[in-house]
């Protein structure tokens, strides 16, 4: 399978809009796509799916073993995809410590040519120094095209193209400034795709702009260059939480990694979905319940007023069914959740903690986890933490993980486990050892 990566010198350059527009434009042309998001972001993949009609996989070169990344790319090939379209994260060379885990690392690992999206709103000839520097910084990462974004006028475009001409890096197109091509945001990033009322119109408009201003034939030439993927379809995956896993999925629980579900299914697990916001219960025969992250703080009143959901989870826990929550799911397993207005809402009360979104503090970064029991994972794990909520009260209980940051600094113990119920603010991505 061929492919390419859309990357940028920095966040906010417009790579998400460009990626979405290209995905929709390529879909309209009949291409069978494999959308990919570099890094741990949960929100962009839902937009990728809306644009392409295909589930988007996160590929994280810091948190995932290279074997897993290769296996997932092979899985996309097996599904019939012909073009892998990856969106980078942050700036091309930005990652964890010393840039490790960057979009550039993913491009190198999968041998993807890079198309650099450059915000040109406040520059002209200086763009040549920027593009030259990026193209020379790592010889194992090939920048094979540039898309000029937020171009002010035909004269501005001519100046930019003239500055870049001596470098030999093809300019694939120039996109005019257009506020209508901006996506709405909130505290954890973009507003979720399912909540964007005009998303379909936005995607069609973005595709029209890409078709009108980008040389799609030149882009195709880039992704058709010779390459070869490793085939490691049988790489070890994280053990599933159970044999029949019920997963919460709606606007309050939207942050789940597709590669985990794919891996669990490959290991024989059955996965079903239910909506707590619709007051649905997990399947009665589920032997594990997974409450992923999301935005429970925006829906706390509805969750507090969902008796069927609340009773079913409580009864399942009493029977010894595994119930595991990450981030927002962890908050819902607790006793109370204070929303941004200071209103306290009763949660499931299965873990002895109280959380608050009114008392906000940013917690962000990659994490190295040592499990302390209560889950089927007995090997070191790699994870990501990103939330503003704070724990305001916590009673004594067994801890779930011993935690270090990406540099190895000890962050203490985190998470709670009581009986078959456990959770933490960490989003588990992969294991870091050799044992499965």
Curated annotation (Swiss-Prot):
This is Hydrogenobyrinate a,c-diamide synthase. GO terms for biological process: cobalamin biosynthetic process. Coiled coil: none annotated. It comes from Brucella ovis (strain ATCC 25840 / 63/290 / NCTC 10512). It catalyses: hydrogenobyrinate + 2 L-glutamine + 2 ATP + 2 H2O = hydrogenobyrinate a,c-diamide + 2 L-glutamate + 2 ADP + 2 phosphate + 2 H(+). The a and c carboxylates of hydrogenobyrinate are activated for nucleophilic attack via formation of a phosphorylated intermediate by ATP. CobB catalyzes first the amidation of the c-carboxylate, and then that of the a-carboxylate. Pathway: Cofactor biosynthesis; adenosylcobalamin biosynthesis; cob(II)yrinate a,c-diamide from precorrin-2 (aerobic route): step 9/10. Its EC number is 6.3.5.9. SUPFAM superfamilies: Class I glutamine amidotransferase-like, P-loop containing nucleoside triphosphate hydrolases. PROSITE patterns: GATASE_COBBQ (PS51274). The keyword Signal does not apply. The lineage of its organism: Bacteria, Pseudomonadati, Pseudomonadota, Alphaproteobacteria, Hyphomicrobiales. InterPro entries: CbiA/CobB_synth (IPR004484), Class_I_gatase-like (IPR029062), CobQ/CobB/MinD/ParA_Nub-bd_dom (IPR002586), GATase_3 (IPR011698), P-loop_NTPase (IPR027417). Its cofactor is Mg(2+). Residues 244-435 form the GATase cobBQ-type domain. The gene is cobB. Belongs to the CobB/CbiA family. One of its GO terms (molecular function) is ATP binding. The active site is at 327 (nucleophile). The record marks 427 as: Increases nucleophilicity of active site Cys. It is an enzyme of class 6 (ligase). HAMAP family: CobB_CbiA (MF_00027). Gene3D superfamilies: 3.40.50.880, P-loop containing nucleotide triphosphate hydrolases. Catalyzes the ATP-dependent amidation of the two carboxylate groups at positions a and c of hydrogenobyrinate, using either L-glutamine or ammonia as the nitrogen source. Comprises of two domains. The C-terminal domain contains the binding site for glutamine and catalyzes the hydrolysis of this substrate to glutamate and ammonia. The N-terminal domain is anticipated to bind ATP and hydrogenobyrinate and catalyzes the ultimate synthesis of the diamide product. The ammonia produced via the glutaminase domain is probably translocated to the adjacent domain via a molecular tunnel, where it reacts with an activated intermediate. The keyword Transmembrane helix does not apply. Keywords: ATP-binding, Cobalamin biosynthesis, Glutamine amidotransferase, Ligase, Magnesium, Nucleotide-binding.
